[in-house]
Amino acid sequence: MKKLWKKGLVAFLALTLIFQLIPGFASAADSRLKDGGEYQVQVNFYKDNTGKTTKESSEADKYIDHTATIKVENGQPYMYLTITNSTWWQTMAVSKNGTRPEKPAQADVYQDRYEDVQTVSTDAAKDTRVEKFKLSSLDDVIFSYMHIKVDAISYDHWYQVDLTIDPSTFKVISEPAVTTPVTLSDGIYTIPFVAKKANDDSNSSMQNYFNNPAWLKVKNGKKMVAMTVNDNKTVTALKTTLAGTLQDVKVVSEDKDANTRIVEFEVEDLNQPLAAHVNYEAPFNGSVYKGQADFRYVFDTAKATAASSYPGSDETPPVVNPGETNPPVTKPDPGTTNPPVTTPPTTPSKPAVVDPKNLLNNHTYSIDFDVFKDGTTETSMMESYVMKPALIKVENNQPYVYLTLTNSSWIKTFQYKVNGVWKDMEVVSGDINKNTRTVKYPVKDGTANTDVKTHVLIEDMPGFSYDHEYTVQVKLNAATIKDITGKDVTLKEPVKKDILNTGNVASNNNAGPKLAKPDFDDTNSVQKTASKTEKNAKTNDSSSMVWYITLFGASFLYLAYRLKRKRLS
C-alpha cells in the first residue's frame, strides 16, 4: 500500500510538472477577443517578475497611458500602447514566446529572446508615441525589455518589467457582425488562395512558387486540394497540417522538363488558414543554400468556381482568370531571415532606368552610399565598417535600407532618427564567425540622407580602450540605383583605415555634477557611469590611432632591448 501511494504521488508530481512546462493553450486563443474586434483595457507596469505575485509598481508605470487598445487583426490580437516622455524610450521589446526570458548578458543584444515593438504613430508636440505588439490573452503577463536614456541627467539603462492587463476593465469598442462560413457541395472547383507568413498577415514569398488558382475536390464532405509547384528544383519538400500535425503532401505527377510537379493534400476547414512548411534549395554566392520556412495558405471559398477536371484523370491546369492576379509579393533576397530563392533570367536584358523617388513595391534595389561626418561632406571613418552596396527593399510599399556592418562586436548600437527620436535599427541577420550583422531602417525613397547614431566600444585590443557615441549621415547615391529583383548581389568588403578615431570628442572622464536620477532600475543595479556623450560628436579621421600603436610598439621594443642587454651583462 505504501509503495502504491508513493507511485501515485510520483505520477501526480510528474503530471504537474508537465502541465507547468506546456504553454497555456487556452490563453493562446482568448474567447473574449473576436477577429476584427476592437477593445479597451487598463494596463500597468510592474517590476520584473512581480506582475503575477506581489505586483510591485515600476517607475516606468508613470510614463504610459494606462488605457490601452486591443485590436484583433486577421485572428491575431495586438495591443496598442501609448508611451509618454517618448524621447526617453530608446527601445521597447516584448518576449518572443510569451515566457519570461533571462536577462541578456549584453544589454543591447536581445533579439534572440525579445522582439521590438512596432511604432504606429508619433506626436512630437506631446512627446508621445503609440507602440504595437502581439498579445495572446488578457490574463498573460507581457514580459518586456526597455532601454531608457535621459541625457539631461546622464541616465542610461536597460531593464526588464512586467506589463499586465486588468481583465475586469475589459470593454468592447466594436465587434464585426457574425458571418456564416461558405460550405461547398460535392464537386470539382478551382479556388484562389494567398500564401501568408506564419505569424503575421503579410504576404509570404512562397506565393510565387505555386500556380494560382488551385484545384479543389469535395466528396462526402472531404476536401482535397491539388496545386502546381512551378519551381520543382527549388521547392524540395512541402508539408501541410492535418489532424494537428505537419504531413508530407502527395505528389500526383512531375514534369522535369518543365520543372514543375502537381501535389495534393487534404484540408479540414477551407475557411481557416492552413499551416504549411517548405524546404527549399537555392544558388547563393557560388554555392547551394538549403533553407526552410513556415507559412499559411488562405483559401477564398467565396470565389471558388466549378471546374470540369481534377488532377489524376485530367491534369490540365485550371484556367486563371486574367482579372485576378497573384498578390504582389517577392522572393526572399540576401540579408533577410529566409535567404534568397532566385530564378536566373533566361536571356540577358538591358537594365531599366530606375526612378529613385518612385520605387516599386516588392522590388529590391542595390545602391551606393556615403557615410559623412556629422553636418559635413567629409567621409567618416565609419564608412570603413559598412559593406557596399546597400540594398533597398520595398516591403508593403515602405522602402527599407539594408546595411551590412563589419567588426560587428565593436558596434554596440546603430540607430536612426525618426520624428526626432533615436530608434534602434532592426537586426536582420548576423554572422558571429565573420563578425558581421545586417540591419535595416525605413527611408522615404532612394535619395534619403539619414542621421545615424552609433556606440562604438573596443575592448579587445591590448593597451587600447575606446568607448564613444557619435553621429554620422548615411547619404544614398541615387545615381547608382539598380533594380536587382530576383538576382543575387555580392557585397564588397570596405577598405579598412587604421581604426575608428576621435580627436575632437569629449573624454569619457569629464562628467558634470551628479544629478538625482529617477529610479528606473527596478532591480537596484544601476550601472553608474561617468561618461559624457556629446549629442553631435564627430569622428576626427585625421587624428589616427596609429600614433598610439606606434608608441606602444616602440616602448615594447625598447624594453626588450634593455632586458636583453641586462642578461648579456
From Swiss-Prot:
Species for this entry: Listeria monocytogenes serovar 1/2a (strain ATCC BAA-679 / EGD-e)
Outcome of mutating Y289A: NEAT domain 2 binds hemin with considerably less affinity
Domain of life: Bacteria
Pfam families: NEAT
Membrane topology annotation: Peptidoglycan-anchor
UniProt key word Repeat: yes
Residues annotated as domain NEAT: 34-173, 184-307, 360-484
PROSITE patterns from the UniProt entry: NEAT
InterPro entries in alphabetical order: IsdA, NEAT_dom, NEAT_dom_sf, Sortase_SrtB_target
GO BP, one annotated term: cellular response to iron ion
Protein name: Hemin/hemoglobin-binding protein 2
Domain-level remarks: Each NEAT domain binds hemin, whereas only NEAT1 and NEAT3 bind hemoglobin.
